[in-house]
From Swiss-Prot:
InterPro entries: NAA25_NatB_aux_su
Gene Ontology BP annotations: cytoskeleton organization; mitochondrion inheritance; regulation of actin cytoskeleton organization
Compartments it resides in: Cytoplasm
Residues bearing PTM N-acetylserine: 2
Gene that encodes the chain: MDM20
Single annotated GO MF: acetyltransferase activator activity
Keyword annotations of the record: Acetylation, Cytoplasm
UniProt name for this protein: N-terminal acetyltransferase B complex subunit MDM20
A GO CC term attached to the entry: cytoplasm
Gene source species: Saccharomyces cerevisiae (strain ATCC 204508 / S288c)
Note: Present with 5800 molecules/cell in log phase SD medium.
Main subcellular location of this protein, as a coarse class: cytoplasm
Amino acid sequence: MSDKIQEEILGLVSRSNFKQCYAKLGQLQKQFPNALYFKILETYVKFKQSPGKFDYNKLLEEPYGLKGTTITGDTRSLEFLHNFFVELGKYDEALHVYERGNFKFPSYELSYHWFMKALEDSNYNQMSKASLQLAKYSDSGNLPKRAYYFWNAISILAVSRFQENTLSDPKKILLSRLARQSLLDLKPFQNVQEIIVYCLVLDELFPQSREISEEIVAITFANFDTSVNLYLKNFILKHTKLLNSPQKLFEVCSKLIEKGLDDYELITNLIDAAYKLSKSKDEVKQWIDENLGDSRNTRLARLKLDIMYTDSVSESSLSYYLSKYHNKPCCSIDLNHYSGHINIDMLKSIMSKYDPEDKDLIHHCNILELGLIGSDSINNYNKFKGTLEKKSVTDYSSCSTFLLEIVKDKCKKTNPELKDVLLCITILENYQAKDPHNFDTMCWLIVLYMYLGLVPDAYFHFINLKIKNVQTDSLDYMIFSRFSTLFPNKQSDFYSKTFHEHNNLYDTSLANLPRYIQVAFERNSYSKILGMLEMRDKLMKSYTRWTKTLENLQFSRLCNDKRGHLLQKLHEDWRSLEMTQSVSFSDNRDFSILDENFAQFLNRGKILEYANLNEESIFLTLIRELIIEALPNGEKTEQISALLKKLPSINLEELLNNNLTEVESASFLIFFEIYENNGKNLHDLISRLMKVPINAKQNWMVSHTYLTKMATLKTLDSLKRIKDKEIQKLIKNSLKELRSCCDDVFKGYSKALVQAYEELKKDECGNLLKELDVKAENVKNIKNSLLGIQKSVRNL
């Protein structure tokens, strides 16, 4: 019944039908005079009716706040109060109502609600308190009393790992001792999960010491008599090494290996310990072979043995490894790790024995990556391109390595020439037809097209990557960075389908993770919980998530769409971030798929400049959108003031120039000027915006500069706060001027692309294409793609 009533009341509020709201609530309060729930609902209605006039202290803080006099144990009232306080940004008060309710009306149900609400809010300090309360009701719950002490320990671990800034040193020491002692009182531990939690407490909450290491080694070593657990393996190995006892290290490693763990870290530590114990090399080698047999790890162990005993890899050990792995992708990775101990001439000699005619593609890639031959990308590609016809369609070939060497070399330059970018596209498009599932070349094609601002072409390859789930968070940067000023087409699948589908990852995952964590607590799957909390933290703070949210707000301004629901969602997400008590962003983007040394492609003027976003640029963009939201009211907000204080304390213009493009900086200053100084210097700043050249760089900056100007001017044009007739006229004239040059801007860019294509047939580029037997792509395809973007832009 209460859910239906709440839904009805909130529905009336959303329609601003306050008269009917009060009538309904008055009727309910007559019917249920002692029901606090309806009084709280009425208070909320008063707030929604007049937020500016709402007397927070009298109506909410005094009765229900930290020192409030009205305390309830009714869970529906507590939940509504909690949500009310959260909406107001009063996060301590939001959970304090549960704490006070438990103090006056103690019960298992109330404590459980408190714990789960704290979990939803990412408030691990409150989870710690609630879990101890739960332990008082061992007969009321579904779990034995001991379980809640493990819940408490995990909560304290979460505070220490994710919210250490909330702990003073004395409090951290107190909580650590409490967690340890409460678990010690539960000995003997009943399963591996309980042992893992206890080891985590010792490992993460206490300073490193011999006593701690001895205790962890003792408790984990005893457990390996019955089972092998990788969490415990990591604990015992780490702390056995800290004990600095070769005998104990050898004992531990040998026992785990005898249990069937073919783990290279264990093997290398076994070898280290054996050497210090003066065991012979042959004895150790024989022991490893007898217990593990033949595997990649045991073959690599021969190299480690040589290095430990003679400081150099022997010919026999190297031959033993290479006889099986010379033509496997792992070969160069493994051997480069030991390159300082391998004689280069010996390595060349042995490698040549296994492929004397140099016909094996992966073997050849390995000798190239091992530095045994010089790079000759063109000849290497031509030598092995015949293998493309023999491979399975769904496999992808290492031939791409040779072509990507050429591409990366061209793209290292600052402000690469159009003809070089088109050359790279031509080479890779030709290759992609022969190796359609090659992930590496598809990623580079996306980046190259995005550098040119040709989003439809980039999108074609992006959807062929078929990325799913968490991959979207790490790879969406390739195509959705600054998308609002690159491809403003609401009807395209790019926006209407893929953008929204990929965004669902955040909403769905963040909504479901608390439930999954709850289940893990209840099923005693303790080892999974901290990992899930970390995943939630990373998704909540994701660079990609926040940049897409802010880009979508700018996109809605550009398209004259209503932004109410987007702003509401922004504030909800921001409150969730604030509740973590660590307002920062997490860079989960994976640039290594493009190159190990990816930083060389990210700087200003580089091929990945469009995706070069950081924490400062996200904060600046967030501040810009919040300022635009606040401008109609003409009032400064605490939220914006707090965010401005988070920025580095340097000159604002310098900060903007370091983190945004020139046109983004000019746009920011316009809105900031209205917010701070009521537009005193607005005329000069608009003139400055219009002077930013659109065609200074013939690449993605053409669309980006034009559309950033357009979004800025359209937003200014819709602001009723601007009363100055001269400024109004300047805005409208600037919009007219911008729209009038649209076709010329894109025709000029199209002409530059055509001219660059013509240059592909000449000189060095033409010779390279001939050597690779590649024909230049039809320029018509790129012209049509640019024309599609031009039409979308012209309609704004």
